[in-house]
């Protein structure tokens, strides 16, 4: 059975590129356009990994990570932050919230897939 990954980004083209790379690697993908939408899309589903942007409307990625980590079912779900933010203090904020990896845009699909393969449980 394919592993499921939730991707959150307010940019449809980014969601499309990430989705194509993940589907090409055999993953199932659920897409959301911000943190509020992402929490709604989780809705008790089995999700093996989450990839989120930081700067999004309604609920940013750091707040989303904090909210996900409060949910017992997703407390240990690995989260990758995929963003244009590259400052160390933002990375520290993301890790403190519970993110396990940080990938800076622009990115190459193999770079993202490498981060995914290191974190997704077999």
Predicted features and spans:
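Charged docking surfaces used in two-component/phosphorelay signaling
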Residues: 16-24
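Short hydrophobic/Thr-rich beta-strand motif most characteristic of the beta2 strand and flanking loop
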Residues: 26-33, 41
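Active-site beta3 strand of CheY-like receiver
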Residues: 46-51
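Active-site residues of response regulator receiver
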Residues: 53, 83
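Receiver (REC) domain active-site loop signature in two-component systems and cognate sites
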Residues: 56
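A Lys-centered signature of the CheY-like receiver
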Residues: 67, 105
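C-terminal output helix
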Residues: 107-117
């Amino acid at each position: 059975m394919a592993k499921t990954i939730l991707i959150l980004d307010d940019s449809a083209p980014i969601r499309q590129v990430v989705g194509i790379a993940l589907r090409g690697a055999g993953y199932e993908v659920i897409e959301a356009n911000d943190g509020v939408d992402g929490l709604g899309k989780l809705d008790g589903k089995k999700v093996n990994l989450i990839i989120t942007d930081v700067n999004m409307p309604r609920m940013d990625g750091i707040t989303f990570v904090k909210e996900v980590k409060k949910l017992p079912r997703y407390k240990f779900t690995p989260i990758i932050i995929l963003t244009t933010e590259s400052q160390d203090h933002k990375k520290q904020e993301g890790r403190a919230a519970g993110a396990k990896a940080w990938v800076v845009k622009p990115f190459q699909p193999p770079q993202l897939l490498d981060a995914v393969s290191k974190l997704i449980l077999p």
